[in-house]
């Protein structure tokens, strides 16, 4: 009965139109649609695999693909220059409004390309799609931000740029101030940063700011300082510790004026950016200042490694076939923090729509990446040998991306949940209500597969 509802039927029809425009556009641009296997070998790609037991090979399992990554690279090595597939993908991870355990990915790969070539094809697709589906003109080339720029200004690697409210660094202003929380944070290598909500003082009373403080603490902040400029003299939680010149400098740096609210967090840089990035979105929604439009942009130059404070190691942030930027390769062993990936995300209104990269084609560099992931030569060959062997016969430079069809449809439909654009979606506990899947199976089937269930 749910499928009879007009809104859901409208969304499913729009999904069909998006799929048709997709196939038409890529066909016209020389792409070949090729299906890749859905019963594959389990390889580490981040999330848990869905496993399928083999009846013929006792004790062995297939995995359902998290992406067609390895196969599409093999296609490039085989001479298929442009590949496209509306691929079914599976990831055994917790559900969110924008995540399902099985999903459809517009998967593409191109040979003899650099990042700019991938961007040109993807931007042409977005321009065509938005025009045909929504009648909206998308200006290209799309804006770009590096990962560092996005984090510094918006506190997110998938920023919503439909509104301003950028993060400002005031560490240099407060490093010697009388307010110990600020001064000590800077002295100990942390940072103090702020966002300004214009004309928000009437909405954000002290009680409302207390709610923001609790939200900030829930994300990891120790507290939240603020300036609430209602009368001629701003109400400030720390003004008595500051000089007039220091307060003036903060107003100038943050652009604060009468009627504004300034939110300030002091902590480690990673925590500060994460907290202010989240508060920025909360406040913008509360003030209803986010315009109803579509802002697409590229995020580029992601860090290749992330420092793990628990283990003291540098962990790889991407799948092992992502190529480092050429100028960074020299730092792979000596300075991991200086290594950036030739990777890119396409972001729409604060939601990651697509992710991709230029791939490694040098066998020695590929070996180095496996080592960085903690894989021995034997482990790497056991998992990926069929691809690395192919590299030795010569590999064209290639790259590509995957665009989430479900997520794209959700955004173009104006929905907030993927379930609203999928005919038979999974619910929050990863079950499918229509058929009752997953379900127990007959003991005879389990015995045939040599599987026993621990109670």
What are these regions (language model features)?
Residues 1-455:
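Class II aminoacyl-tRNA synthetase catalytic cores and aaRS-like
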């Amino acid at each position: 009965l749910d499928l009879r509802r007009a809104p859901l039927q409208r969304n499913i029809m729009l999904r069909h139109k998006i799929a048709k425009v997709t196939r038409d556009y890529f066909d016209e641009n020389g792409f070949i649609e090729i299906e890749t296997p859905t019963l594959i070998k389990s390889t580490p790609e981040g999330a848990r695999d869905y496993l399928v037991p083999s009846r013929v090979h006792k004790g062995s399992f297939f995995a359902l693909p998290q992406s067609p990554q390895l196969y599409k690279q093999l296609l490039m090595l085989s001479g298929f220059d442009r590949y496209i597939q509306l691929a079914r993908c599976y990831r055994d991870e917790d559900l969110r409004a924008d995540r399902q355990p099985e999903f459809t990915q517009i998967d593409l790969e191109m040979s003899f390309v650099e990042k700019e070539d991938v961007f040109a094809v993807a931007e042409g697709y977005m321009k065509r799609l938005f025009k045909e589906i929504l009648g909206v003109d998308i200006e290209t080339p799309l804006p770009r931000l590096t990962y560092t720029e996005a984090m510094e200004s918006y506190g997110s690697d998938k920023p919503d740029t439909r509104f301003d409210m950028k993060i400002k660094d005031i560490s240099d202003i407060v490093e010697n101030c009388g307010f110990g929380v600020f001064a000590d944070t800077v002295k100990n290598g942390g940072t103090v940063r702020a966002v300004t909500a214009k004309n928000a003082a009437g909405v954000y009373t002290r009680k409302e700011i207390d709610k923001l403080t609790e939200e900030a603490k829930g994300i990891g902040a120790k507290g939240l300082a603020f300036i609430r400029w209602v009368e001629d003299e701003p109400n400030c939680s720390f003004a008595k510790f500051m000089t007039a010149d220091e307060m003036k400098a903060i107003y100038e740096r943050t652009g604060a004026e009468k009627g504004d609210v300034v939110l300030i967090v002091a902590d480690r840089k990673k925590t500060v950016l994460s907290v202010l990035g989240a508060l920025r979105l909360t406040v913008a929604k509360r003030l209803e200042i986010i315009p109803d439009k579509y802002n697409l942009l590229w995020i580029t130059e992601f860090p290749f490694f992330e420092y793990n404070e628990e283990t003291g190691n540098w962990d790889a942030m991407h799948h092992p076939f992502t190529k480092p930027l050429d100028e960074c390769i020299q730092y792979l062993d000596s300075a991991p923090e200086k290594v950036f990936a030739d990777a890119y995300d396409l972001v729409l209104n604060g939601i990651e729509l697509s992710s991709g990269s230029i791939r490694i084609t040098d066998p020695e560099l590929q070996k180095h990446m496996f080592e960085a992931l903690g894989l021995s030569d034997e482990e790497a060959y056991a998992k990926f040998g069929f691809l690395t062997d192919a590299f030795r016969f010569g590999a064209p430079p290639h790259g590509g991306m995957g665009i989430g069809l479900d997520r794209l449809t959700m955004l173009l439909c104006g929905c907030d949940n993927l379930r609203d654009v999928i005919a038979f979606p999974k619910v929050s506990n990863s079950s499918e209500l229509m058929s009752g899947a997953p379900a127990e199976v007959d003991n005879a089937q389990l015995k045939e597969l040599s599987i026993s269930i621990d109670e």
